[in-house]
Structures are given as structure tokens and as C-alpha cells.
């Protein structure tokens, strides 16, 4: 301190805050001026002063010191709003999943960064001496990021693999985390724990490998005599001065440096601070320096090529173990910096664009000449400013000036009004984040079930020519058409046909697969035949056992056009039989005076197509006999003879026959309305037994009475029956009968209440309780019914020319469904009388079965359907051409083995109510899709819940626009007859005339011509897209008549907007919220199937946006299930920028693993490089120079990659250390197989300098390949087998060395340590006795020639600097090959 006191009058007092960086510079100046000893004495005094001040200040930290930033609330709301809009765009198909992920991450990262930037001004304004604020900028272990997590928001987290979790933690640690945020926080914080434990060991292992590969590198000579060097230049300001200084200080010049004609530095002069400053000042020529790359030695290094020692400002001493120092210098920062993640808690620290926000409300103004319009990387319109742009925001009382840096995006227009804190500009990230990105694959999974379609061309990837992998050539949408898929390898392919109607929610198809998909159709056929034909066809046969086959339940209505016994009527080989009846199915037109509505008649046929005697063929429920309320039935007990005697009854599974108890034919019969409730035993009843209640009285907690009257409660079998009798209660003196019906005009004439009755009455005698003797009489109104003969089902089935035999008879029977004399019915909808059509044939025939099937005939586009019934002598007489399953192998658990077909509700109706009926949400249509596997078949069930209807459009004024747009091309094929439901079967999947229908001569016109079809179709203006992709226009093509079974194809859709005159074609896909009418946008996305003039219906579809190069999985029209892989994107993804991700990159570079994907246009770059080399150097030099430049370029590129990782973390490592490592992994070449076989064995690894010397000695061309060895392989390919054996694979290395007879000259450190010898470094280093001046003259002459050759090489390599600066930068990924940057 005496020196300081003496010099105080001449020194200036600086009142300035010193941070860590300034302290480093101060210590460096102390060492330069006063030396190390005196500097340590000064720093001890500074340390003591710091502890004394900290004790006096006594800074503490409490929870009240954590001040939350006020602007956080609306910043988070703004980010949530942006995320919501982004989610909407993704749902509409405007943004694909990768864009959504990337933009979401950028939104939240920008919000978190803005909060972090606002934190410091907030502390300075509100509490500048806040302990948290003081600690965060003290330079100790901790930074602003941790304080930001305490008082701002924790933000985005990184998982242990370094990938971002796109769900941000919006809370900070002061507010506390929710459960979800806590789980994500633990997941991210686990990253710090993992890094501390595992990555530390990785860094230690990296240090061991680095030391292993360079442990023998020792400074052994002063000068190796090389004239080569590497050129370094500031590149006209492209290289930062700081990096330029770090690169040059401590190096040795390889050539003289001239400014004009004056030499300012000579060869072999070391570069200090003063010389570097002169280089920067004068902007001298590119400077050639000596590096370890240019040293001529193989196993050591010279003083001048290494340069100054890092410890002191002088050339490195001889005997210095610079290799071990280099390995430690690279490995040690990795070990230390691994711990950084633990302190940041796994928070993502990436580089994205920063936002500039408006300071206040006002009008923004800027010079429009300095900007030009463009789009941001997300496609949003913006202005790009090429230089600094000053923006003024004029509010009412103040004008704010904001400076926008160059290459930024301005997101507002000139003279636009902006609100406070609105984002007005986006600043590009200052540091390039390319080194923090990697190419990854992102799989997109389907979130719905249906069929996949696309509206663009795709092509197969060449490596998957026969697979289902497709590449998209351009941006397009993938669509999932919604539906309920079902797949099975069992026999339903012969049961369910295309266009079948079924209950959409009854089959076990809904997300339930057959449990044994390995069962093939052949196994099912074998099982069915063996069980079906095993017994004799007599009464008492056992029912075939199908329990081993998997089951599928089916309830409700199913519309089966082709029963399985005939397999679509396509392959019968039976002989001609006359026991056949064919019934034409008439289409009943609306508007006729008819008693039978067409929707009430159903044909009932078993699923296997087999009918027994007295089977019900069709039935009709008369609406006049339907009651909507519960009640009692009453009729006389007089019974008629049954149609079928009980002893003649043959019971067969699933076929309904007439039981005698059904055959009560009474006329009239009566219905007594009574309200009946069946309640559970645990129900709380709120009315009493024998009480009288009014209408709408609370009975239980959730039930009310519909009528008023007497309440009777009965308990039966764990259930309570509550009956409410409406009517009058009388207490007569005596009663004769317990039950009595009084007709109109009846009653006792001597009664006081005598009155001529107009209606039927029902009198019932009742007791108040079981033990009471007194009776009372309940008088109830009665509804009488008479059965009429007006229902004539025979009119629907006329006997005509098609009937070949009188053996088969059809009888019409009316019967009452409820047979007890008094039966209580509590259903809400009761059918009292049913009319049925019974099939019968002669008793003397021994035939017990008849087979029924539907036949469809087309002539000139006209379609007609028939029901055909054949008597079958035995099942063997029916054989199939393809050995198909003659019956179904499915058992229905509810015992109902029949299809209810309603062919009379036809599409010929012009009623809109019928259209609504066909869109019943409980109905669905089966669509068959062909699988690549021929043994199985895929079905998709399309219900009306997958469709939506729009309209009617009342404001459509010109329907001719629609007509004209369709008439231009009435039959439009869509993707080569692939319809909207994929590669389905055609509407009729069998040959219509492959078998003989009848032997009688008939006139086809009698059955196939409908006179009033033209009139009907002129009323219906709609356009239909069918399975084959053809467009049917019944309005203009009246000869096309749709099959009446295709009820479900009433999916109508037309997209029409009068304002924009939008005309949408059939089959087109529409995204959500497309304008189709004046009422507003449409709500769902889907595909156009059918269109009408005034209303439209679409089939719902889910769009997915895909970019060019994306991989599509699956075929067009293929069924996809929820969770299936839909498309794969390849994109660049940001990785977190901490050292845990950088350290593996260092390891990848030094182990020479590929870390960057190969450029797409690599071939063009190589072609350009070859042309450039040939043009400048000429043909003879091309290969020789090319091999040399390849090694030089690869070395410089590796150094730059390693430095880039460390510099991104603020770690400074001298290039010398990395160069020593890289020299070792690039100093080997691989001997080619065609040359040098007489000197080296093919494929042998030899040193690069050794190969060159051998070539010069042999005076012949040397063929070798430059190879990059990783540090592990380089450690295993040294001159010392003892060093290799001590590293790894000891037994193999020693055995191989013994077989080859290798000699270890013990030149390295490790082998001497193993054998206990003196290590050749430091005090154990021996100065070389032979210097170059002792070499004889003739050898000196050879050396001189060699030097001349090297001088020529140097001229070619390093004096054509324009060539290197231009060509190398254009033809290689790394453009800084000459700068170590």
C-alpha cells in the first residue's frame, strides 16, 4: 500500500460500480503492471473490505421482498388470447400441428422474456434497495432468470431430453403453483437433478478421453521449420474484434506482415497486445499464423507452433505437457457448467424474437419510405425496416419516440391508433439460434375415427413403393371423414352389405373389435357347416352351438337387402323348381287415398333367409289401434280355433310362428285407461293406498300423476305397482258381479241415478283392504274398439304372372297382442291389434323350410325390387360357386334372428318429413370398404350424427345458377371412381341376371315402368353423389331411379352464397366457417354429398394441414381409428440453450458423429466446388489440392463448431487447446485398396505425414482417403499399445499387439506411468542432442528442395485468398473456415 499512497496525487479517483467483468479486467491490468504476488495482496484487501460491508449491511431475504410485476396479469391474458386464436386456426385447418407448437412456444417465451425485462425497471422504480434486486445483480451464483421465476412467471420448461414442454407455467413461485403446473415443474426440475448426477459423469468421461488422445503431446523442439500457416483476417468487419484479439494473442507469425512497403512484424514473432492493436488499427492484410495444425511433427509439437504459455506471457517452455493441458481445458468447463442447469431449474432458455410494445395510447407515425411490405415467419403481414427506424406515438399530452432496430418487423400501419402495451414491432433474435435447433420428426395422430382422404396428388416414396407411405408434393389438407368403423376377420362380410340400415348404437361395433382376429373365413365356414348339418331336420333337434365363435349383438331395425343364405343371389346352382313365389314390392305414392301409410308395413325375414310354416312374412301396425297411455284390456272369453294346432308347431330358433294364445278374435274389445307405475322397492312413495289424488300430484321424487283418481298400491316380487283409477266411486247397497261392462243405454231403470248412458262404462267392485267386508264400486270410462276388414295386405302382394305354383299361400290374419281377459299394460305406446301376413304351404308336402331373398332388377336405368320365396327340400341342394358361407355364423344374444325390412318408405316421396325421418339419429348406414387383406373386410357405419344440414335458404332468388352449374357436367368422376366413402362396393354387388328368376313369359314393361316418376322428379331438385363418385341428377335424367332401400343416402349438401356467387361442386371439401349463405358462416367442416336448391347437408370431416415433404401414412379411403398415425412432419426444433445440450454436442463433434442433417442441395454444391477448383487450379492439381484442402477445411470447421458451443455459454477456451485435439483426430488416413499394397495393407490407418513421406521416398502416387477418427478411435490407434490397453479392451489390444509383434517406444506419459519409468515432461524431459545444423550437406540439399516444394504449395494455398474467401464460403456449410469463429 506504500506504493499506492505515494502515487495517489497522480491517480484519478473513479466513483463507479464494478461488476464481475470489470473486476476481471482490473485484475488483468494489475498482473501486467505489478505481477502476480502484488496482485494477490491487493485482492485480499478487497475481499476483506467486501466482507466488512456485507456484515454492516446485513441483507436478509423475506417473502415480502418478492414483489410481483403489476403488468403480469394482462400480459398473460394477451398470451392466452393469442393461443386461443392459434387453436382456432389449427381447428380450421389453417395451421398444422408443428406450426401450432412452434408459435405457442414463441408466444409464451416472448411473454416470459418481456416480463423478465420489466422486472428490473420495476425494482428500480419501486424498491431499488430490495434484497432480491441487489442479490440478482451481485454476480454471485444466480441470475435474473431465477429472480424472474420468483416474481414473474416460471414460463416454459424443458424436459430431461432438452425438448420444450409447450404448456407454460403461468404462476411464479411467490404466488404458488397449481397441481398441473407443479407436475410440469417437477418434470422440468428433474432435468437439473439428472444433469447434476449423470451429466457430470459424462463430462468427466469426456475429459478422460480427451487426455487419453493427447497425453503424449509434449513441446520437444523450438522450431519444426514449417513455412505453412493459417490465414486470419477480420473479414471487413464480419469477425468481432474481441474474437479477433483472442485468436491472435499468444500466436506466432508464419510470415512477415507489411503495410504498404513497410514491414511491421516479422516471421516467428509472437503476437502481443500492442501488435494486435496495430493490426486492428491499420486493417492490415490477412495475417498468417502458426498453429498446431501446421506443425510438421507427428507425436510432439514445437514452441513456435504452440505459441505463448497460458500461464505467463512468454513462449511455452520445452518439456511442457501441452496435450494434457488441452484435454483438461476442454473437459473442465463442461464439468463445471453442467451444474448451471440445477440453478435455473430446467427453465427453457432459447432464442426467439423480442417484442416492442407501445408505451401509451396514441397514433403511430413513421417514414413509409424506409420500410417495405413483407410477411413474418408465421405468414402475417408486416413491414420490414432495413435500417434504424424512428417511430413516434402521439398521445394527447406527450409524444413518445421508439427506435426500431434494423431487420425488424413492424406489425402496424402508418397513422394507426395503437393501445398501450400493444405489440408494434418484432425484433429478430440478436444471436443466431441455428446452433440451438435440430431436425426432428413430429408424428400427428388422428383424434377421430373415419376414412382418410386428401384433395391433392401424392406420390410414393421410392423406398416404400409397395407400402402405404406417401409424400406430399405441395401444401394441402388431409381429411378424416367421420364414421364409426368396425373391422372383423369373421364372417360378417357375407351378412352386412353396403347401404344396409341399422341401429347406429346397437351393434357391438362401437370401438369393440372381435377378440380373435386370427380366425379366417374358412374356419368359420367349416365350423358353421359342421354344426349346421350335423343333426336331422326333425322336431327336437339340438340348436347349433355357435358358442366357440365370437358373438355380435344386434338390436333394432336393420335393412338387409341380401340375406346371407343366398349371398346376394349371385351363385345359385339349384335345379329348376316350381315351388316358388315372387312378390313385387310396390312403392306406395303419397297423396293416394289409402288406409295403410307406407311407413307402417314391415317385411320380416330371418337373417339366414329360412322361413318355417306359419311364419310371419310381413306385419302392419294400424295407427288406429295404438294407445299412448297405459291401461287394461277387456273382452269376452270366447276363443276361436287357432290357425296352427299346438301339436303341429315346430319351434325353431329365431323364427316367429303363431302361438295359440295369440289367436283371440273378439269383436268388439275394450281398453280401459288406467295410469300404472312400476316402482322399485326402495322408492319413496308420496301418496297413500286408497287415497284420492288430483291431476299432477307428486307420486315419487321424480314422478307426477297424469290423471286424478283412486290410488291402489300393490307389492309384487321386489317391485311396487302403483295404479291410479280415474272415474267415479259409488257405495251401493249390494253388487252382483265383481266386474261388469255396461253398454250405452244400459243400467238399472229403477236406479236413482238412472240416466241413459251414451258411452260404455266399466264397473269394478273393490275393497278398501283385505280385511274389510264392505265394498265400493268404481265406475270407469271405456274405449271400445272394433276390428275392421279394411286392412288388406294382399293388395300389396298381388298374385300375378310371376307366381309359378299354388303350393305357397299367403294369409292375412288380424290378432290381438294381449291375450289375458284382463291385462294390465304399462307401456307408453301400446299396439292393441296387429295385422300380419302368414306364409303357409300344403301339409302333405314334407318340406319344412322356405328360403326368402330380395331380387333387384334393372332395365334401362329403371329399378324394381321383388321378394322371392322358394321351397327348399334340403339345404344340400344349395351350393355356392365360391364355397361361400350359406348362412350367418353370428348368434344374436337377444334371440331375435330376423331383419325388419321396410321397403315401402321409398325415396320417391316428395315429403320433406320423410327426409327428416331418414336422418333419424338412431339409424345408420353400413358402408363396405375393401381391405388390402383379401380375407377380411372393413365396414364403416355412417349415422346422421356425422352429418349436418343447412337451410332452407329463403333468400335464394335464382335457383337456375345451381342448375346451370350442374348441367355442364352431369356425370363427374371423382378420383377415378373413388367416391367419398372410398373404394366401396358398387350399389348392387352382384350380376343381376346370372340366375333364372322365372320360366313364365312376362312383359318387363308391366313391372319396370312407372308412369308418374317424371312428375315426382320434377318436384325434387337435388343432386346426389353416390358410392362410385357419379353424380345423379334425377331432375334432368328422369330414367335414373334410386333404390328404395337406399334411405340413408339423403345426405343433402349445397354450398351457395348469393353475395359472392360461390358455386361449390359435389364432392368438394369445405373448411369450417365458410360463407355459404347470408345468415352467416357454416359451423362445421365436411364434404359435399348431395345438394338441393334451398337446403344442404354435409358429412362432417376433420381437416389436417400438411406441408410439402410431409409423410402421409395410409391409403386413400382407408379406415383410421382414433390414435392412428396420420402424418409425419420433419422440421427444425429449438432446443434449450444450456450447457447440458451443448456438452453432448461437443462430444458429438469430437467423436465425429453426424450432428447436422445433410443439405438437400448437396449435389449442386459439390458440382460447383469441382468446377471452381478445376477453373482456378487446372486439371493436374485438382485432386492433390482437393485432398489437402479437405483436411484443412474439416479441421477448421471442427474447431469452429466446438468453439460455438462454448462461446454460447460465455466460456472462453483458446483455440490452441481445441486444435491439438482436432489435429489428433484428423491426422490419420485410410490406405486405398488399389495402391500401396506393397508397403501397407489395404484399409490400414497410417499417419498423414507418414504417408506423404513414404510417397516421396517411393516417387510414386499415393492413394489414400482422409478419415475423421473420433477421440475414442484415435485413442485406440496410437503408437503405444500399452496406452491403448490401459484405456479399454485390454485383452484384445495386448493379444493383437503380441501377434503383430508391435514395439512400444515409451514416448508418452501414460505408458511410462504404467511401467514406472520417468515421464518425459518437465524435469524428466531430455533436450534433443541432434539439431538440424549437424545434418550433412547432401541431406540439407534434399531438405531445401522439400522446402521449395512446400513454398510453392504455400503460394497456391494461402496467397489466393480471394478464392478462398469466396469459394469456400459458398460451398461449405460453415462459412467461417478461415476465422475460427
Curated annotation (Swiss-Prot):
Biological role stated in the UniProt entry: DNA-dependent RNA polymerase catalyzes the transcription of DNA into RNA using the four ribonucleoside triphosphates as substrates.
Pfam families: RNA_pol_Rpb1_4, RNA_pol_Rpb1_5
UniProt cofactor(s): Zn(2+)
Subunit-structure text: In plastids the minimal PEP RNA polymerase catalytic core is composed of four subunits: alpha, beta, beta', and beta''. When a (nuclear-encoded) sigma factor is associated with the core the holoenzyme is formed, which can initiate transcription.
Catalysis performed (reactions): RNA(n) + a ribonucleoside 5'-triphosphate = RNA(n+1) + diphosphate
Gene Ontology CC, one term: mitochondrion
Species per Swiss-Prot/TrEMBL record: Guizotia abyssinica (Niger)
Lineage of origin: Eukaryota, Viridiplantae, Streptophyta, Embryophyta, Tracheophyta
EC code(s) of this entry: 2.7.7.6
Family classification: Belongs to the RNA polymerase beta' chain family. RpoC2 subfamily.
Location(s), subcellular: Plastid, Chloroplast
HAMAP family in alphabetical order: RNApol_bact_RpoC2 (MF_01324)
Official protein name in the record: DNA-directed RNA polymerase subunit beta''
Cofactor note: Binds 1 Zn(2+) ion per subunit.
Presence of the UniProt keyword Nucleotidyltransferase in the record: yes
GO BP terms in the entry: DNA-templated transcription
UniProt keyword terms in alphabetical order: Chloroplast, DNA-directed RNA polymerase, Metal-binding, Nucleotidyltransferase, Plastid, Transcription, Transferase, Zinc
